[in-house]
Structures are given as structure tokens and as C-alpha cells.
A protein has these predicted regions:
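Residue-level signal for the nucleotide or nucleotide-sugar donor/cofactor binding architecture
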Residues: 83, 123, 127, 329
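Hydrophobic residues on the short alpha-helix immediately C-terminal to a glycine-rich phosphate/catalytic loop
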Residues: 91, 159, 337-341
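Conserved beta-strand scaffold positions in the cores of enzyme catalytic domains, especially
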Residues: 49, 101-103, 316-318
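Alpha/beta-hydrolase active-site loop signature
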Residues: 82, 106-110, 177, 295-296, ...
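Catalytic active-site module of serine/aspartate enzymes centered on a nucleophile-bearing elbow/loop
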Residues: 285, 311-346
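Flexible "cap/lid" subdomain of the alpha/beta-hydrolase fold that forms the substrate-access gate
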Residues: 1-47, 122-130, 137-138, 142, ...
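Conserved HGGG/HGGXW glycine-rich cap/lid loop of the alpha/beta-hydrolase fold
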Residues: 58-117, 139, 149-155, 162
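Generic structural signal for small/hydrophobic residues in well-ordered secondary structure
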Residues: 52, 62, 76-79, 88, ...
Length: 346
């Protein structure tokens, strides 16, 4: 993941050369809303959508499926970096068959508020965590099954550390930010000097600045860099719906993106690695770690968590044929595995 983030980081930031140009992205909140509507149009299940207002004038964009099944512990979905609720389009219908499912855009991403985040990694992380807790209070949820992908997995773990009584089961899907950067990382995987130099030059800029600088060419850039997303959602769309959604999610004001940058060190590693803190987590919180068998992510975090929590429930599941975006690569298998986990709760 570190390598993938850094490559994207460097490629996109070439746009800094043209940073004197005015913003010229053909986007708006209305464009993002319309792109999200297209992502969700194939979902037959009924659902509620609303802004949930939290302190400091912020609001969290929220989707709720099967609200009438409130007798079971609800499943709450946290998306990854650069994502939004629309990327769960392949999962909602299956997951909400037997229980309520909530999905929301993380603070600073998607259609949620995009406030200023602290430049300190600890404080930025806490802002994310507190926004999740404030959302939970406003939604009136006593306990939840918390599932997070990528950055969402990191934040789900951080939330569980601070508010353990609210989490019935923690599901980490290809989580970012768990291992610390090894001292010999550069020796095992040598990084060319020119890349280090480029990274130093570009360090003041946000990871996706180049996408915004690209303006009307940004959508083509998304399509060129990530053609795999069209294939992942081909059962639902045969056009550029997914690329349009990702584009409009990420050319708005870079709020959560800036927070993420401030939580990382070269080259994509977390400043405050989660594995260092996992032993402090309440021993009664069950954890399931889900990885794609074909993922470029190091899957050792699951076994490391097991060794760090010898007296707690920890299970690792590998989804065959799936990469980092497990929920989209093999949605049927992923959905069934998550439903099985939820059924073990109640």
C-alpha cells in the first residue's frame, strides 16, 4: 500500500508546476450528488438518506438500509481514502437482508463536511474518531458492528480503542496504517534517489492535487490510472459511472485528504502505526481481519494482531481472487463472509 500511495502521490503532484492556474474543475456538490445517485440507482432495496448534524457545524452524509431491523446490532461501514458511500453499491443489498446497515461519508470526504483538520497526526486522528462518536450519538446507536476498509479500517480501530463499549465486533478490511515502517524498508525495497528527491519537493502538496489541477482532464486521468474500477462494477454499469463518482469525490476541497497526508510519513506509512496500540484495545472486542488473496497489501497484520491479543478473539479471512478492493473484486464472497460474522454477533 505504501508503494501504491507514493506512486499516485508523485504522479498526481506533477501538477504543482501549474499551481498558479485558477481552479477549473468541472465539479460541484450537485455534480457529486448526481454521480452518487447514479452509483446507487441499481439498488432495489429501500433506504433512507440524510445529513446527520454533529457539533462544530459539521454534517455527515448517511445512508441507512433496513431501518426496521433495529432489534439486531447494526452494521456500520467506513470507506477508505478517496472513497464514499457509493463504492459500497455492490454490497448494500446483501448486507441489509437481516440487519440494519449504515454507511456514511467520513468527515472530510464525499458529501460530508470538509472542515479544517489539525496538522498534528494525533489530533487529526482524534477529529475523525470524535466525528464517528458524535454521529453514533445523533443516530441513537448503543452498539454496532464496525467495518472499515483501508483508512476506514484504521479509523475503526482507533474508534474501538477510545470507545470500546460501543463496538460489538471490529471488522478490518485491508486496513491501512497498521505496521510501522521497518528500519530496513529502503534496503529491502530500494527507492531510487530521484524518487526520494521528487517526494521531498512535492511534500507540501496534497496527494490528489494533480487531479484538481488537471481540471476537465481529471476524469480522463481517473479512467486512465484506474481502469480496473470499471471492470469491478461491470455487473452494474457499462459506462463511466464509477470513474465519475471517484472524480467528483476527490476534486472537492481537500479536507480529509489533507488530514490523511498529515497522518503519514514517507512513503505512505502511518505516523502512528496501529499495531503499536492494538495491545491496549479492550480484550473483549472480537476482531476479524479480511484480506484479498491477490492484494498488494502485506497480510501479516492479521497474524500480528493475533499474537498481540493471545487471549482475545482474532480471526483472519482471505478472499480468493480479490485484491485490495475486496468488497468490489469478489462481492458475493465478501458479503457472505461479512454476514456470517454479523450472524455470530446476533
Amino acid at each position: 500500500l505504501a508503494e501504491e500511495i507514493f506512486i499516485l502521490y508523485c504522479c498526481c503532484r506533477l501538477g504543482w508546476l501549474f499551481s498558479w492556474l485558477p481552479a477549473w474543475c468541472p465539479t460541484s456538490l450537485l455534480h457529486l450528488k448526481e454521480a452518487e445517485d447514479k452509483m446507487l440507482k441499481c439498488i432495489a432495496s429501500t433506504y433512507n438518506k440524510q445529513y446527520v448534524y454533529i457539533p462544530n457545524g459539521n454534517k455527515i452524509w448517511t445512508l441507512t438500509f433496513s431501518p426496521d431491523l433495529s432489534h439486531k446490532t447494526p452494521l456500520v461501514l467506513l470507506h477508505g481514502f478517496g472513497g464514499g458511500v457509493g463504492l459500497w453499491a455492490l454490497n448494500f443489498e446483501d448486507l441489509c437482508e437481516n440487519r440494519t446497515v449504515h454507511a456514511f461519508d467520513l468527515l472530510g470526504f464525499g458529501r460530508s463536511s470538509r472542515p479544517h483538520f489539525d496538522t498534528d497526526a494525533r489530533e487529526a486522528e482524534n477529529q475523525f474518531v470524535e466525528s464517528i462518536e458524535q454521529w453514533r450519538k445523533e443516530m441513537g446507536l448503543e452498539k454496532m458492528i464496525l467495518l472499515g476498509h483501508n483508512l476506514g479500517g484504521f479509523l475503526a480501530a482507533a474508534y474501538s480503542l477510545k470507545y470500546p463499549s460501543r463496538v460489538k465486533h471490529l471488522i478490518l478490511v485491508e486496513p491501512w496504517g497498521f505496521p510501522e515502517r521497518p528500519d530496513n524498508a529502503e534496503h529491502e525495497r530500494p527507492i531510487p534517489i530521484w524518487i526520494k528527491a521528487l517526494g521531498a519537493i512535492l511534500s507540501p502538496f496534497n496527494p490528489l492535487a494533480g487531479l484538481r489541477i488537471a481540471g476537465p482532464f481529471g476524469l480522463s486521468l481517473v479512467q486512465r490510472l484506474r481502469p480496473d474500477f470499471k471492470r469491478k462494477y461491470s455487473s452494474m454499469f457499462d459506462d463511466n459511472t464509477v470513474a465519475e463518482y471517484i472524480y467528483h469525490c476527490n476534486v472537492q476541497s481537500p479536507s480529509g485528504e489533507t488530514a490523511f497526508k498529515n497522518m503519514t510519513i514517507p512513503y505512505g506509512w502511518a505516523k502512528r502505526p496501529m499495531l503499536q496500540r492494538i495491545p491496549q484495545m479492550d480484550r473483549d472486542i472480537p476482531i476479524t481481519v479480511v484480506y484479498g488473496a491477490r492484494s498488494c497489501i502485506d497480510g501479516n497484520s492479521g497474524s500480528t494482531i493475533q499474537s498481540l491479543r493471545p487471549n482475545s478473539y482474532v480471526k483472519t479471512i482471505a478472499i480468493l481472487g480479490a485484491g485490495h478492493y475486496v468488497y468490489a473484486d469478489q462481492p458475493e464472497d465478501f458479503n457472505q463472509k461479512v454476514k456470517d460474522i454479523c450472524d455470530s454477533v446476533d
